[in-house]
């Protein structure tokens, strides 16, 4: 949807080479970029165009590159361009066709602070927060930050270091205690992030307290699980609700915080509100006894209501329609302050991004990508030695790249990037293409930060850059690293 002059601005112009860079986006053009033969690209295009119900779906990997925002949008264009949306068997191009369906809601709490930052930008808000604005850092709810972050509360997470880009940069910022003055970490295990805490509080695990979990991301069913405690919390471990209630009591605000309710009272209230809306859920006493309630859902078809009646069922875009050309993005591109190489465009375009495969150098000739490991959920369970034994933390390297470096499976190798260095066991395999290496994300960082900083734990974020993506200001570098490998 475009109200401005469309000359040389349409998606068709970009694809056909009659606008923008005047380069026709043929299969031959795409082949060296993708590493896929032109004939195979043409066959895929023909198959998509001929399919009665093409189900086009992307995971969350493509967006986690420095050029991933445009890649993600381009994938969503495929079903749009052939008109195969809102029909049985089709999809929107996203991973989830529809929002998740939860049987139970959350606490009725509204944050009185409306100013917010992209979560990936938190360390910059510590280092130079007052320089961050809506146009250079994606600040929302205000034109700029008026203060640097001075206090950090990290609950049940490992993103101070381990799960955040460029660990060495983060460490250097945190080492200056005139910047971030106080760190509170509240967790069940001693993560690398927990090592930076001024105060470390031991939390009760979910299995050590009454808890409720919801499952809503499946297309075919939704569920709620109530249970616990399976065992008593050891030592001084306590639930966060009870601790916060005691803190509120010290300020004379316990009644305002708890509203006279225990943790179970709140969980019961939330459950019963969901049960009332659902109409078929068990009573509170019944769900506590049976533990799980699962309900089958009708299969969702993405954008089916919009296709049926686009006037009655407009989308949440400014125009209410599918926007191949975005006036909103055009305005952002014209007004935001972008780093050299950053691209925001009103249509999806190909851009190599920064530290992409086209950025390799003689010093860093390999492209490195992260991926999820089967023994961990991000960094959760990364401290369990039995899991490490059966599913080792290994770098994937193609035989051609390994042979030229004298590397065999089982060798310990040094991996260097502009951001840092790790040690990791090599796995030589043809399952990864030449010129590219893969490192499972989530391994626990283990380095002498007062010494050589070489990470013996092989955390991929020792190698990543901190620079965020152009639009969302998010974690694009997770799969965009340039590196070199040598036998250690």
Where do the model's predicted regions map?
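Extended redox/cofactor-interaction regions of prokaryotic respiratory oxidoreductases
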Residues: 77-196, 204-212, 230, 288, ...
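Phosphate/diphosphate-binding loops
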Residues: 169-172, 178-182, 188-191, 223, ...
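Long, contiguous, secondary-structure-rich segments that constitute the structural scaffold
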Residues: 238-290, 379-381, 385-396, 400-488
């Amino acid at each position: 949807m475009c109200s401005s002059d469309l000359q040389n601005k349409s998606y068709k112009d970009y694809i056909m080479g009659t606008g923008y860079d005047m380069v026709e986006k043929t299969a031959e053009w795409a082949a060296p970029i993708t590493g896929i033969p032109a004939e195979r690209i043409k066959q895929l295009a023909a198959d998509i165009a001929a399919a009665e119900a093409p189900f086009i779906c992307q995971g969350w990997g493509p967006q986690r590159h420095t050029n991933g925002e445009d890649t993600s949008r381009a994938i969503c264009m495929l079903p749009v361009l052939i008109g195969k949306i809102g029909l049985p068997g089709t999809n929107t191009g996203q991973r989830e066709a529809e929002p998740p369906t939860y049987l139970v809601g959350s606490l009725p709490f509204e944050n009185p602070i409306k100013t917010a930052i992209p979560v990936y930008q938190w360390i910059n808000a510590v280092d130079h927060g007052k320089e961050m604005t809506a146009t250079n850092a994606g600040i929302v709810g205000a034109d700029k930050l008026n203060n640097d972050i001075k206090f950090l509360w990290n609950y049940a997470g490992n993103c101070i270091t381990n799960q955040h880009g460029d660990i060495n940069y983060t460490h250097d910022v945190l080492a200056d205690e005139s910047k971030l003055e106080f760190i509170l970490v509240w967790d069940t295990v001693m993560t690398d992030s927990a090592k930076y805490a001024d105060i470390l509080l031991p939390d009760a695990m979910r299995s050590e307290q009454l808890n409720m979990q919801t499952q809503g991301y499946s297309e075919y069913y939704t569920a709620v699980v109530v249970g616990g405690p399976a065992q008593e919390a050891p030592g001084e471990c306590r639930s966060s609700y009870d601790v916060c209630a005691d803190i509120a009591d010290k300020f004379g605000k316990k009644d305002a915080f708890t509203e006279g309710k225990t943790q179970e009272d709140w969980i019961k209230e939330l459950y019963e509100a969901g049960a009332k809306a659902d109409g078929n859920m068990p009573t509170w006493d019944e769900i506590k006894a049976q533990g799980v309630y699962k309900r089958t859902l009708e299969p969702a078809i993405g954008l089916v209501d919009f296709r049926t009646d686009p006037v009655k069922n407009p989308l949440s875009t400014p125009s209410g329609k599918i926007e191949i050309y975005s006036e909103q993005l055009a305005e952002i591109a014209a007004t935001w302050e972008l780093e050299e190489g950053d691209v925001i465009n009103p249509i999806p375009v190909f851009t190599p991004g920064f530290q992409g495969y086209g950025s390799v150098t003689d010093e860093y000739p390999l492209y490195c990508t992260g991926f999820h490991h089967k023994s961990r959920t991000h960094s959760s369970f990364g401290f369990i030695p039995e899991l490490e034994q059966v599913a080792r933390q290994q770098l994937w390297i193609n035989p051609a790249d390994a042979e030229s470096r004298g590397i065999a499976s089982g060798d310990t190798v040094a991996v260097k990037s502009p951001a840092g260095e790790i040690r990791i066991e090599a796995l030589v395999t043809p399952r990864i293409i030449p010129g590219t290496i893969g490192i499972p994300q989530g391994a626990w960082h283990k380095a002498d930060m007062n010494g050589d900083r070489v990470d013996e734990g092989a955390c991929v974020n020792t190698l990543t850059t901190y620079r965020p993506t152009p639009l969302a200001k998010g974690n694009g570098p997770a799969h965009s690293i340039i590196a070199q490998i040598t036998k250690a």
